[in-house]
């Protein structure tokens, strides 16, 4: 146990000055300064060769204070460390080579000075005989181990510091990359929002144009419908005027008398009737033009032109038929100069032949135009087709 404690003492201590015999008298206040090459602060008590020593660190090294001495007035066998070849000067070696603390050597050899040689080997009865080389080897191994530990700690510390730097750099790098990605995504989202805003504005403008076009189409169709209705009223009014201007009587069909007496061609009523019929032909022509205008408007606005234009085409067909029939009546039966003899009277144009073509013996009286005449039926049918076109368009 004594040798083990001695080993612990030498492990922590490496003084560099000469020490004389340490007086362990408790009444003595003398203390001895011992300097060490390195080590952490040490404050402890050790038992060395029967002398209890208290080790305390001050600004210059370690102070040994005798606490007790079981074997005399001084501590035996305590020698100061010295340098040994092959060992770092920062960790002097210790050597036990005597039986008395009075035999000491300087452990530190200043550069350019000669070191004090080791004392002779102690006698065989020395309690510490033969331990010098063992302690040297032990201290060498301890120093080597601690040097390796210090080197390892320094290496590990450097690796840890380097790892921390790399972690910090990697963290900053990845944070910058993430920030760039977030910024790029934010910029793309901003561009998409601007694009959607432009689309919204375009849609709003398109809806406004569609509403404007619908309003314009409605106005045009309403105007055409008004013109058609106004023309229809004019046609009916003209027919009534024609009926009143021609005069005459309605004669039931009579096989024995196929050609009743016609009116005088010089009569003012006869001439007025011809003028009225010519005006109504112009009215029908105007209606036909208005139907063409409506057909053009529907072609540009209707989503299904074929469906919307069908009633218009039917109305045009009916009006064209009515117009042709009325022209035929004038050209073939009224304006021709065909002469018909009746009881030796002068040749005069006759209306009865045209009227008989429809199954009526109608002479000089157009009172049945508004009810039975085929032309009126065609005009009314054309108006019905026009109304159907309007319903399809605004449904």
UniProtKB/Swiss-Prot annotation:
Residues 252-265 have a biased composition (Pro residues). InterPro entries: CTXphi_pIII-N1, CTXphi_pIII_N1_sf. It comes from the Bacteria. Pfam families: CTXphi_pIII-N1. Gene3D superfamilies: Vibrio phage CTXphi pIII, N-terminal N1 domain (2.40.30.280). Residues 247-270 are annotated as: Disordered. This is Uncharacterized protein VC_1460.
């Amino acid at each position: 146990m004594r040798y083990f404690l001695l080993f612990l003492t030498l492990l922590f201590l490496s003084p560099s000055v000469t020490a004389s015999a340490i007086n362990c008298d408790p009444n003595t206040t003398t203390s001895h300064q011992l300097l060490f090459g390195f080590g952490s602060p040490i404050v402890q008590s050790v038992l060395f060769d029967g002398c209890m020593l208290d080790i305390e660190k001050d600004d210059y090294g370690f102070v040994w204070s005798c606490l007790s001495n079981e074997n005399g007035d001084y501590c035996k066998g305590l020698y100061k460390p010295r340098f040994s070849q092959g060992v770092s000067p920062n960790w002097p070696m210790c050597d036990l080579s005597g039986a008395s603390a009075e035999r000491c050597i300087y452990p530190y050899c200043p550069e350019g000075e000669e070191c004090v040689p080791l004392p002779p080997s102690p006698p065989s009865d020395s309690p510490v005989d033969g331990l010098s080389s063992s302690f040297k080897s032990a201290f060498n191994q301890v120093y080597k181990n601690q040097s390796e530990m210090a080197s390892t700690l320094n290496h590990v510390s450097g690796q840890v510091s380097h790892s921390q730097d790399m972690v910090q750099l990697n963290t900053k790098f990845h944070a910058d990359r993430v920030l760039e990605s977030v910024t790029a995504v934010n910029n793309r989202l901003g561009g998409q929002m601007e694009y959607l805003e432009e689309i919204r504005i375009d849609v709003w403008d398109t809806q406004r144009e569609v509403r404007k076009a619908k309003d314009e189409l409605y106005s045009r169709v309403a105007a055409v419908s008004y013109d058609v209705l106004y023309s229809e009223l004019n046609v009916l009014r003209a027919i009534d005027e024609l009926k009143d201007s021609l005069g005459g009587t309605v004669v039931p069909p009579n096989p024995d008398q196929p050609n009743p007496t016609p009116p005088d061609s010089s009569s003012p009523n006869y001439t007025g009737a011809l003028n009225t019929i010519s005006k109504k032909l112009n009215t029908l022509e105007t209606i036909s033009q208005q139907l063409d205008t409506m057909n053009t408007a529907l072609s540009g606005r209707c989503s299904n032109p074929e469906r919307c234009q069908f009633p218009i085409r039917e109305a045009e067909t009916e009006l064209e038929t009515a117009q042709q029939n009325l022209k035929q009546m004038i050209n073939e039966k009224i304006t021709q100069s065909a002469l018909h003899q009746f009881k030796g009277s002068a040749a005069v144009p006759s209306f009865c032949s045209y009227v008989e073509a429809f199954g009526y013996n109608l002479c000089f009286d157009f009172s049945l135009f508004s009810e039975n005449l085929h032309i009126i039926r065609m005009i009314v049918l054309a108006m019905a087709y026009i109304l159907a076109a309007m319903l399809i368009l605004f449904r």
